[in-house]
Amino acid sequence: MRILKKKMKLKGKVKKYLIDKLNDNEKLHFSLIDPFKINSSDELKYITKNLYNAGTDAFLIGGTLGVSKDKLDFVISLLDDYEIPKIIFPSNINLLSEKADALLFMSLLNSDDIYYIIGAQIVAAPIIKMLQMEVIPTAYVIVGHGGTAAHIGKARVIPYDNFELATAYTLAAEYLGMSFVYLEAGSGAPEPIRPEMISFIKNASSIPLIVGGGIRSVEVALKLVEAGADIIVTGNIIESDVNKAIKIIRGIKNK
């Protein structure tokens, strides 16, 4: 069991924290917390304590629908004692908070709407500067099912079996200077991204891969890690069965 420590000063150091872990050949796990789906502070404390003790490397905070600034700040404040990063996973510019340690500064590369590729980022940039937030440049690419994120973001989703197209997007992100590529099958996706796609991409690109959506078992998570995923994200399973989420985290961290 991890011991709860005094909060580390992570602001301005989150990207380095993650890259250092990856350079030490660690595989990482992010726990995605959707403030809209949290029913009480007691529920959140119970869930996050178990995720932290299992070894999750960071908390992602965000959701596609129904998240207010007040709810976002409230959730981040309840996570304040944990010495792992609290990173905002934004769906729009309303999800910004100086209380977080960092922000995934994302561009939805396969959107048909320029707003989600660069428009929202332009509007948000002065606010981020004012709040003095650390940004982690991240290419967001939606694959397969896509779910609500694909619908809202007007994404031209990449088919599960089109490995070449997914690789082309990943290489484009790498050449643009992004720090990470986040491959997303969508919240609650019936099928996760295929390990074969991950290994195909990894044969062509060296950029760290974040993979999420439809990951409901430790077996699936480990296949993705073995294929080359650097960071696994779980969200829905945390809400529906925290014990399964714990098994996934322990499987990844004990790999």
Swiss-Prot record:
UniProt cross-references to SUPFAM superfamilies, sorted A to Z: FMN-linked oxidoreductases
Superkingdom, natural source: Archaea
GO molecular function: imidazoleglycerol-phosphate synthase activity; magnesium ion binding; phosphoglycerol geranylgeranyltransferase activity
Organism: Saccharolobus solfataricus (strain ATCC 35092 / DSM 1617 / JCM 11322 / P2)
GO aspect biological process, one term: glycerophospholipid biosynthetic process
NCBIfam families documented for this protein: GGGP, GGGP-family, PRK04169.1-2, PRK04169.1-6
The protein's name in its UniProt record: Geranylgeranylglyceryl phosphate synthase
Catalytic activity: sn-glycerol 1-phosphate + (2E,6E,10E)-geranylgeranyl diphosphate = sn-3-O-(geranylgeranyl)glycerol 1-phosphate + diphosphate
Matches recorded under InterPro entries: GGGP/HepGP_synthase_I, GGGP/HepGP_synthase_sf, GGGP_HepGP_synthase, GGGP_synth
Taxonomic placement: Archaea, Thermoproteota, Thermoprotei, Sulfolobales, Sulfolobaceae
Keywords recorded for this protein, A-Z: Cytoplasm, Lipid biosynthesis, Lipid metabolism, Magnesium, Metal-binding, Phospholipid biosynthesis, Phospholipid metabolism, Transferase
Residues annotated for sn-glycerol 1-phosphate binding in this entry: Y182, L183, E184, A185, G186, S187, G188, G213, G214, G235, N236
UniProt pathway: Membrane lipid metabolism; glycerophospholipid metabolism
Enzyme class, UniProt record, top EC level: transferase
Similarity field: Belongs to the GGGP/HepGP synthase family. Group II subfamily.
Function: Prenyltransferase that catalyzes the transfer of the geranylgeranyl moiety of geranylgeranyl diphosphate (GGPP) to the C3 hydroxyl of sn-glycerol-1-phosphate (G1P). This reaction is the first ether-bond-formation step in the biosynthesis of archaeal membrane lipids.
